[in-house]
Amino acid sequence: MQKREILEKYKKEEERILVAKLLDKIELCEKRNKMEYTDFLDEYKESMLKKVLNLVKTDYICFGGYEEAERKLLIVYPEKLNQVFEENKFNFNTIISVIRINPLKEEIKNLNHRAYLGGLIKLGINREKIGDIIVHENGADIIILKEIEKFLYTNLCTLKRFKNSKIEVVKLENIINKKQEMQECKIIVSSLRVDNVISEICKTSRNKASENLLSERVFINGRIYVS
């Protein structure tokens, strides 16, 4: 299927741009006979691009730094690398890095996922360059593209919220991974308003549910819900 035919399937400009970028990377992969990869994708974008890859029949793998990652890179690669990826011999540390932030104990309680992400955005980092942010009892492990590692390592300490924190770069195999717990819920709601549904699922007030929405803690089909 030709590039133009594929792009015509997508009416939203954001989706067309994303698909076009992927198709460009596939062309580069074939032309240069070397792997190419996207920025970090949320679950919705990953699912959409996988459908494109099924149309063009290109070898690919999705990886976000650890097995349970929600945000992943999509890597397309030439036939010569089939064995490398099939036998898990590729060193992902060459394209993905992890910045560990260890704040002072008395400051940890004031830092949540949004605070860590906000710090990166304040430094001018594009969200797509950032993978999962794993918040743990000692701080956070932030998965990023290798290309921004040096900049973040040098500049994170210039932010007031991190000025007393220990900043270090760690390997993917040393990520402090908190296992996600999944729970299936069956609820009855008076309306399908999102805050109403969240309130019932979390057994909390509508106001608290609205706070979670504003804090970008709610995902629907892999995408942050924006009211």
Describe the role of every protein-language-model region:
Residues 188-227:
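A basic, amphipathic helix-loop patch mediating RNA/tRNA/ribosome contacts
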Residues 1-201:
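Ferredoxin-like alpha/beta domains used as RNA- or RNAP-binding modules
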